[in-house]
Amino acid sequence: MTLKIAIAGAGGRMGRQLIQAVHSAEGVELGAAFERKGSSLVGTDAGELAGIGHLGVAVSDDLESQKDKFDLLIDFTRPEGTLEHIAFCVANNKKMVIGTTGFDENGKTAIKAASDKIAIVFASNFSVGVNLVFKLLEKAAKVMGDYCDIEVIEAHHRHKVDAPSGTALSMGEHIAKTLGRDLKTHGVFCREGITGERKRDEIGFSTIRASDVVGEHTVWFADIGERVEISHKASSRMTFANGAVRAGKWLENKANGLFDMTDVLDLNNL
């Protein structure tokens, strides 16, 4: 049976890429596309919006009216909107792939609670390469982490509204967990003025926002006399869109539970 997918935030940069990814993938079809209430894009054909021609799926601002047209919702929007969509999906037994970043602890708790009822893949980054980098960071941290300074440097386009990026935070969390540290107490997100000498157990973060950078992340493991850098650079949002569709297909036979791309890609068995 073909998996029917809906896209939230269909008119955004990521939403349009997701429409393209669904259209080009095997075993899935676009069932619905959504925009915020009152958007000028409501009624527009989703395929024409994404530049791939007429698909016969009109953008809607009402999930309830479209609920019989999709099995799974892919959501890369804003935390407040995603939380509303989660409530709808729980009430209507719809699976979710969530790529929204910037959730506070209450938001993360809501996602975990929802996963008791429905199947969710929630990840800060859906790139296969980035998720492989997570595993490489764990290995590097295990070998070098207690003997070097660790810094996470990330760059994104000028329109990104949260900092550091969800991916950068995930990188820090993978490193911290490997080293038995708590990122909340060991993460350093701002340095200015007289900061004093750097502590060995800090995990530092630096953020760049400029132009149209899709996404770049580099982690330094810096020791005296040498430095190891692990980097990932994305040149197109399609890498994230294709990963999200892959995650959706992986969820097809899952009834409930909270998963991430480590599960989708089976990286724990590397």
From Swiss-Prot:
Gene3D superfamilies: Dihydrodipicolinate Reductase, domain 2, NAD(P)-binding Rossmann-like Domain. Keywords: Amino-acid biosynthesis, Cytoplasm, Diaminopimelate biosynthesis, Lysine biosynthesis, NAD, NADP, Oxidoreductase. Catalyzes the conversion of 4-hydroxy-tetrahydrodipicolinate (HTPA) to tetrahydrodipicolinate. This is 4-hydroxy-tetrahydrodipicolinate reductase. (S)-2,3,4,5-tetrahydrodipicolinate binds at residues 157, 166-167. It is found in: Cytoplasm. It comes from Haemophilus influenzae (strain PittGG). The keyword rRNA-binding does not apply. The keyword Transcription regulation does not apply. The active site is at 156 (proton donor/acceptor), 160 (proton donor). One of its GO terms (molecular function) is NADP binding.
